[in-house]
Curated annotation (Swiss-Prot):
The protein's name in its UniProt record: Stress-70 protein, mitochondrial
Xref: NCBIfam families: PRK00290.1
Its EC number(s): 3.6.4.10
Biased composition (Basic and acidic residues): 646-656
Notes on how activity is controlled: The chaperone activity is regulated by ATP-induced allosteric coupling of the nucleotide-binding (NBD) and substrate-binding (SBD) domains. ATP binding in the NBD leads to a conformational change in the NBD, which is transferred through the interdomain linker (IDL) to the substrate-binding domain (SBD). This elicits a reduced substrate affinity and a faster substrate exchange rate. Upon hydrolysis of ATP to ADP, the protein undergoes a conformational change that increases its affinity for substrate proteins.
Domain of life: Eukaryota
Lineage per the UniProt record: Eukaryota, Metazoa, Chordata, Craniata, Vertebrata
Amino acid sequence: MISASRAAAARLVGTAASRSPAAARPQDGWNGLSHEAFRFVSRRDYASEAIKGAVVGIDLGTTNSCVAVMEGKQAKVLENAEGARTTPSVVAFTADGERLVGMPAKRQAVTNPNNTFYATKRLIGRRYDDPEVQKDTKNVPFKIVRASNGDAWVEAHGKLYSPSQIGAFVLMKMKETAENYLGHTAKNAVITVPAYFNDSQRQATKDAGQISGLNVLRVINEPTAAALAYGLDKSEDKVIAVYDLGGGTFDISILEIQKGVFEVKSTNGDTFLGGEDFDQALLRHIVKEFKRETGVDLTKDNMALQRVREAAEKAKCELSSSVQTDINLPYLTMDASGPKHLNMKLTRAQFEGIVTDLIKRTIAPCQKAMQDAEVSKSDIGEVILVGGMTRMPKVQQTVQDLFGRAPSKAVNPDEAVAIGAAIQGGVLAGDVTDVLLLDVTPLSLGIETLGGVFTKLINRNTTIPTKKIYTVCIGELNPASSIGIPPAPRGVPQIEVTFDIDANGIVHVSAKDKGTGREQQIVIQSSGGLSKDDIENMVKNAEKYAEEDRRKKERVEAVNMAEGIIHDTETKMEEFKDQLPADECNKLKEEISKMRELLARKDSETGENIRQAASSLQQASLKLFEMAYKKMASEREGSGGSSTGEQKEDQKEEKQ
């Protein structure tokens, strides 16, 4: 807070100027920056070292995440351990403390709904009291709680996790996928965020990258990344619109592509509108119909709700290619009369009616973006669709009606953002040349003085990085003394404040006393967010989880090896039982029994112990089978010798 006196104060806030005055609360913009939001640091380091190694591009999505790397001049989307090109952004904790990420976590969600976290990107960088968060608390089976700093966190088995931590676990999975493909460690990354994310949300995403062990070189906007994926190999100049309706957020960006320069003209959106809302709307419809038909209210049964939620998501996807689908969930619940089954037919028209209001919510941001960019729909040469929800025919029709042209399907809506992030990584590493990305800040930054007068310093849709200098007067009772400004009569000291938004869209401030020339760098943080100690502790926890994952993988591989050796040994013992000494067979059977006892307590054993025991069993079995082989070879030689002798006798008799 920069205070003029007891009676006059100026405080830094951000606002989404495109919103209504009633909605333009401080937390809607740069998350209510205040006196507590300043952290003073001695200097700001702008130096950047040469980037070593590959730079991975990661789309950290609400529903699914994707990772890509540059191979030469082309970006390649990588498959995860399950063979899929996208990974569910789902993290679960089992009763025994095991952490699951991706598809394994999603598969067990029905039986463990309270400890399975999904769509936590909608919580990242948000306060618990935000209306959107309060709305989410009623829609998800897991607990959303107020952290000590006032942020929204989640709880599993009595432990609290920040949304940045959950995002970090997903990023670790992406990092592992990249490392498995590259064959070496991947440290550098470009991570994407919704274009309409504010400062707190962007910083929280960077925190997630740091917790996961990544060096986040840049945070870029998802529509901009998709534009890079679309336009990298295009030679013609044109204005394009990127309509990005994903799992949890909606963005619209207008860009001009000209000779390798990607300039964002404007951006707009809604950070709480996406596929999750479509799923929730359909879920409410199904629950309502089920109650009407059976009289049973499913809202109190988390396990049943999770089954319905998964069925709703599946039906939504099917209706993009079919005009009708069946929703069948046998034994969904039961009452005094017995089990209840869900059998429902759903048409595409019915589904479109259920979600029509959600689709309409994307129209106003698109119109505002065109207005801010000073373009008409006739000026737009291409409309790019990004995000899984753009596969819905009604969404595509809405886009066509809005922009007056059929949208392009030139990019994969699930992969384009990760590809664009990888391209930007290539640009930063110097591997991709002749590409320049000029992005914008989505929200305005300004100063509000006593009386509620708001002065914009940096307007929304200003190209970043950017800076603005503003001079304020400081009175004798002011907190600015902490940066070394001596006490003086009111209005005498003049402080030159520089507001700087970097290429990641994150705000920095520097303050300079024009009288003394003394200068201090200020990094703006929201009153919430993660402290340095929080992040360090989370990094340690993430490393602990990574070590546990490594040990678990080692143990599983050792168990698989041991079970294979047992199976092979028993098979060969049965096959060669006539050639094996009985006493040696009994000894080997005892070894197998000991091995099985060890496997029975595998969870308390290390992979190395299991591997050593399995190797000992294998060596013992090989010695025994070697004996059997020699015996069989000897018998064959004996039978072969007698056969040869008989042939010679026969030949001798024929000659006589």
